[in-house]
Amino acid sequence: MAKLITNDDTLRQYLPNVFATVKGEVSLFDKVMVDIDLAENWVIETFVSTKTFNTICGYTADNPIRIITAKLIASEALRRAIPSLDLVLTPNGFGVVSNQNVTPASKERVDRLIGSLADYRDDCIANLLPLLSRESDWLGSVQASFFGETLFPYLAITEQVKGNGSKWERYLALRPKILDIEASLADEWFSPELLLAVRLENLKGSLTANRKIFVREAKAQIVGNLNGETFNARRLADIVNFIRLNPDDFTEWHNSETAKLFAPPVFKNTKKSKGYFF
């Protein structure tokens, strides 16, 4: 049984103003109750975690994270339910009907409605994730680990990389590519130890000034690569030099095996050696 959206009035409170009430019909809430349960479980398992969701349910109705979570559940529930609903376009928006004498809305309109709800859902996801990072319980969850596994824990990356489709679907498609790129940069330039540390700090919003600079520059290289550009070796070298010049801010790198790639052993000839040149 759903815990955050429990009746028709609450459901409509969190939906875009497109569904009109049709007199004599079963309430929209009753029609999509199963989808609300499914959407709530999806939000918990994908984004929020059970512990954090229970905390959110205890917040007051005007709490920002509670409002965004409810909007996300409502939009996803309706997006799932629409294919099984009978819809009619009324002067006040779409209505849910079962009267066979009423002509349903066209497939094109319904498809556009589903797309609009997906966009609305994705906007909710984009707004929710930064709020979740302020919840201490959430930071220790499996869900936080998923989003914190790259330098791009939020959906903003989808606005920086070319592509089509919903933001959430594109984020999921980009994620494995980002993981591969970051792994390559870690091994060859930045060290796995440093990236592991700054990813968590980036998620928590606790980066120091110099580490913010590093993350900004590293992300710029990753975004460029995702858009089909080759890595800028000169720029990567500049980033490494920045790390080398600020050892107190990047101890993970200085203690790593990767750092040794940029500090080759110095060979000195003795005066007895042939070819002595100094």
State where each predicted segment sits.
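Conserved short "hinge" loops at termini or chain/domain junctions
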Residues: M1-I67, S84-F278
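Extended, hydrophobic/aromatic-rich amphipathic alpha-helical segments that build helical scaffolds
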Residues: K71-L85
